[in-house]
Amino acid sequence: LHQLIHSFPTRRSSDLAYDTIQAHFRDTGRRPSDYDLIVTGDLGSLGKEILLDLFHRDGIEFKNLEDCGVLIYDAQTQDVHCGGSGCGCSAAVLTGFLLNGMKQGRWRRLLFCGTGALLSPTSTLQGESIPSICHAVAISTEQ
């Protein structure tokens, strides 16, 4: 389990996802191609594009990156702007779609990277930073 917690007002969840995924690859020696699917939690379409840009800057291209906030809706037929958000979004996509897809043999190796922000109205009104978090869990099925 890789987890990074930051409390900087200028850090986006996409930045933390980048840091966590990089740490996972560095610590395990794995690459994006070692996974059938890499999924972030509720960055939405904008956050996903920011994350892809961060990796592109380092010369790393993903063909297997998805986001729960994008997967949970059909942006072509629903007016959802950037997609879903919140911890329920990631939980629903992981347990209702991704794990079932693994059971059906669609994917064998998954890197799931949940992201979030610990929002507090009091902290925000006091001008304090918004702590953000990202954790990565590698999930695989037996061969």
Language-model segments: residues:
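Short, flexible, glycine/charge-rich loop motifs used to bind or transfer phosphoryl groups or to couple energy/partner
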Residues: 1-3, 26-28, 100, 127
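Short, well-ordered amphipathic alpha-helical segments that serve as non-catalytic structural scaffolds
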Residues: 14-27, 93-98
